[in-house]
Amino acid sequence: MITVYSNGTAMIQAYADYLNTNPYLSQWFFVDGPLITKPDRQNYAVSAGTAAAPLLCVRVAPFSTVLFGDPDAAAELLDFLLAEDYEISRFLTSETVGDAAVRYLWERHGLRYQEALGMDFMEAREITEPSCDAVSAPESEDLPEIIECLENFILDCGLEDSVDEASQRETLSDFRILRADGKIASMAKLARRDAPFDTITNVYTRPEYRGHGYARKVVNNLKNEIVSAGKIASLTVDKKNPVSNRLYESLGFQRLFAQGEYRRV
């Protein structure tokens, strides 16, 4: 059964227990859901399937639609979204749901989607090496350089996102940076969650400083901060990037599952 919600919070409340069965996969529902207050074809919260086996989706423009739940409900959900002209040019979900959706979109609707970015979700629960004193939080005057690094990070990852300068200014203290030659050589950001885990995001090293262990020090410092606070450190890494995978594994991160962003081609 299809249900269109008047706001994202209503969906979260209706399926809170279900979403909490996998807080890693469902985290974007708690981030994006409250932002949906006036739903339309670009910003929406919709569910399909049954109460026991639903497939939930939320979208906040300009970001990807996020899917979570039972792949057997993919046909019902996708038929509705397409028939009602909802924006679904790209979506983020587990590989299980993603593969089912891609297959159905092609076989039933002749629409070709492909996994544009495959990611491994990893977590770490222990401190494995000491923090580096050279890693620090940025100052307000570092914001332009951080914005520059974020824009380069988006290009490197092949994402279609844009940088919201106001948002980054508000969360500037959550970044950690490591300098070399008077500029930011490497950085990462702490995304705080109302959950047992926090996430390390936006890990970026300037090309001329790669291969020298800068990212390792920044990520390790953030991991240590998270673990010391009694939480689990989590991150996602491109499955096609073996260098980063080995780096995170050497810091004690373990792979839990795979997810991907799928785009229409």
Give the predicted meaning of each segment.
Residues 33-34, 60-61, 165-204:
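A conserved beta-strand-loop-helix scaffold within acyl/acetyltransferase catalytic domains
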Residues 72-79, 205, 211-227, 245-250:
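Conserved acetyl-CoA-binding loop-helix of GNAT-fold acetyltransferases
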Residues 187, 256-258:
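Residue-level detector of high-confidence beta-strand sites
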Residues 1-27, 124-160:
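Short amphipathic alpha-helix that is part of the acyltransferase structural core
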